[in-house]
Each structure stands twice: as structure tokens, then as C-alpha cells.
């Protein structure tokens, strides 16, 4: 079982930043069997380069749920799954950081599509989305 995820954050330093958006698709190897997506109010400012990159700004997040309000759903949809993400190391670390801030651990195996792309398509000049 896989949980394919994408996360947007307030900046590039996972231990200082917060999540602003998350999307997760639970995939059983044949089809998507569950999904969850939400903006998240990180309770901190978004760095200007991130606003420019993602289009997500603080005003959009004012009424969004806080991480603690969606944490249970994230645990449920990723339970018994391998997390799949582009640059999985960053997304996984910021998820772990957010759960640690709540006093909980979050442990999952990961697959990084950047590393897979580099292995399968070594001739490509770059691997960003």
C-alpha cells in the first residue's frame, strides 16, 4: 500500500518551517482508494519566495485548519503505507517535525521519486517538477 503525497511549506528549512498544504492519495497498487487534501494554517509567515513559487499566501490560510486538526487524518490515510514523494526526504522530515511539535512520533518507510528518476533517467539534466 502506498501513500502518494505532496506538501507545500512556509520555506525550505524543515525544522523551522510549517506545512501550508498537503495532498495524500492512498493507492493499493491498482487504484486510489482514499484521498485527503487541505490547506493548513502554519501559524507563521510564509517566506516571499514560497508565495511566488506556490501562489499560497497567508490570507488564504487564515481560516484553514491547523496541523493538529488534520494530524489524525494524516495518520489514518498513511497507516501501513510506504510514503511516495518527490524529494521524499524533505516532505517526510517536515511531517515528522510537525508531529514532534505535537508530542508524537511519525514513522513510515519512504520512496523518493527524485532518486528513482535519477536512477532510471541518468541522462536528464535536472529532476525538479
Predicted regions span which residues?
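Conserved non-catalytic scaffold segment of RNase H-like nuclease domains
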Residues: 1-108, 122-128
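Histidine/lysine/aspartate-rich catalytic loop segments that bind and position anionic ligands
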Residues: 109-120
Amino acid at each position: 500500500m502506498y501513500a502518494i503525497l505532496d506538501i507545500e511549506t512556509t520555506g525550505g528549512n524543515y525544522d523551522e518551517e510549517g506545512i501550508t498544504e498537503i495532498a495524500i492519495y492512498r493507492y493499493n497498487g491498482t487504484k486510489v482508494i482514499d484521498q485527503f487534501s487541505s490547506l493548513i494554517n502554519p501559524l507563521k509567515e510564509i517566506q516571499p519566495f514560497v508565495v511566488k513559487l506556490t501562489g499560497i499566501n497567508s490570507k488564504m490560510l487564515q481560516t484553514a485548519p491547523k496541523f493538529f486538526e488534520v494530524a489524525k487524518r494524516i495518520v489514518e490515510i498513511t497507516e501501513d503505507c510506504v510514503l511516495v514523494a518527490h524529494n521524499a526526504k524533505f516532505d517526510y522530515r517536515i511531517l515528522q517535525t510537525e508531529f514532534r511539535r505535537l508530542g508524537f512520533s511519525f514513522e513510515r518507510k519512504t520512496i523518493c521519486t527524485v532518486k528513482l528518476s535519477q536512477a532510471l533517467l541518468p541522462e536528464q539534466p535536472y529532476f525538479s517538477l
